[in-house]
Amino acid sequence: MDFGALPPEVNSARMYGGAGAADLLAAAAAWNGIAVEVSTAASSVGSVITRLSTEHWMGPASLSMAAAVQPYLVWLTCTAESSALAAAQAMASAAAFETAFALTVPPAEVVANRALLAELTATNILGQNVSAIAATEARYGEMWAQDASAMYGYAAASAVAARLNPLTRPSHITNPAGLAHQAAAVGQAGASAFARQVGLSHLISDVADAVLSFASPVMSAADTGLEAVRQFLNLDVPLFVESAFHGLGGVADFATAAIGNMTLLADAMGTVGGAAPGGGAAAAVAHAVAPAGVGGTALTADLGNASVVGRLSVPASWSTAAPATAAGAALDGTGWAVPEEDGPIAVMPPAPGMVVAANSVGADSGPRYGVKPIVMPKHGLF
């Protein structure tokens, strides 16, 4: 703009009629505050990153993090410097305005000059005001030049103060597509896991099928064998088998009865043989049998202690097995009498199925000739 072409009324009016330097001062303070905050943030972030990467977190990941944050730190530093420069430029503009305002002719003086010129011109009838009119015009010219000079200086200072560093947006310290890549990776991992699970299910199914295929011949053979057994059991053969079983049961019963009889015979033979001289037993053997429902003493065996009955050797216990019947005593209910003996008569101890003479009435009926005969009862098979 050509401020020299404008009269002082315009320039002075513009300078005095504007907003002044208050807005520039407020802008400078705001930019200064931004510069301080951004600078503090840059210092704090840099300190934290340095302490973290050198004291607590070290390694490739730490270096990668520091490298990713470094552009952001540079941006913070540049922004703080630009804000400080803007604040300084705003202050310079305010100072330039103040200078221009001080150099600008007040509009009141310009108006007064113009009023004086008009009065001098009106009263200059005889030319007496020519010098005053010239002085007034000269003063007005000075005002013109002064306002123009002030405006040019202000315009130049404002142009310098308006040169600011362009502000930029911070660069991304992370990959903007990272979330998408993470979601894709998660989906791929899930698909892979599902595929592995399906593959495992197929593998288990194949193994089961293989096992069943291997077991099929064995199962078929087992089924065939079971079917043969079932058919065999459905024939008349089981009748023969049942008859054989019954026959075997009879043989077992016979063997059991024979063993019982042989046991009784062995007991009796052992008793008699133990009393004979030179018996086969080298040590005394005691054997007791208590038949159910029959009174008497137990069956015993001993070596070298036999009693004598006539010409026979009998066990010593026979002499006390049963009380002897008095000599010449008549038996109840009979006409027989017991012959007199030199000593007590020993009798055979009670055996199964036998009755002791002293405990039975009429059991010894009949003639007596020396030793009382021994009667073995007949035992049935078990």
Curated annotation (Swiss-Prot):
Entry coiled-coil feature ranges: none
Practical applications: Expressed and presented to the immune system throughout the different stages of the infection, which makes PPE44 a very promising antigen candidate to be included in tuberculosis subunit vaccines. The immunodominant T-cell epitope p1L (amino acids 1-20) could be useful in the design of anti-tuberculosis vaccines and in the immunological diagnosis of M.tuberculosis infection. The recombinant HspX-PPE44-EsxV fusion protein induces strong immune responses and is a potential tuberculosis vaccine candidate.
Localization terms from the record: Secreted, Cell wall; Cell surface
SUPFAM superfamilies per UniProt: PE/PPE dimer-like
Domain of life: Bacteria
Keyword Transport among UniProt keywords: no
Predominant location: secreted
InterPro entries, alphabetized: PPE_C (IPR022171), PPE_dom (IPR000030), PPE_sf (IPR038332)
GO BP, sorted A to Z: response to host immune response
Keyword list, A-Z: Cell wall, Secreted, Virulence
GO CC annotations, alphabetized: cell surface
Family: Belongs to the mycobacterial PPE family.
Function: Virulence factor that modulates host innate immune response. Induces the production of the pro-inflammatory cytokines IL-6 and IL-12p40 in macrophages via NF-kappa-B, ERK1/2 and p38 signaling axis. Can enhance M.smegmatis survival within macrophages and under stresses such as H(2)O(2), SDS, diamide exposure and low pH condition. Promotes the death of macrophage by apoptosis in the later stage of infection.
Protein name stated in the entry: PPE family protein PPE44
Encoding gene, per UniProt annotation: PPE44
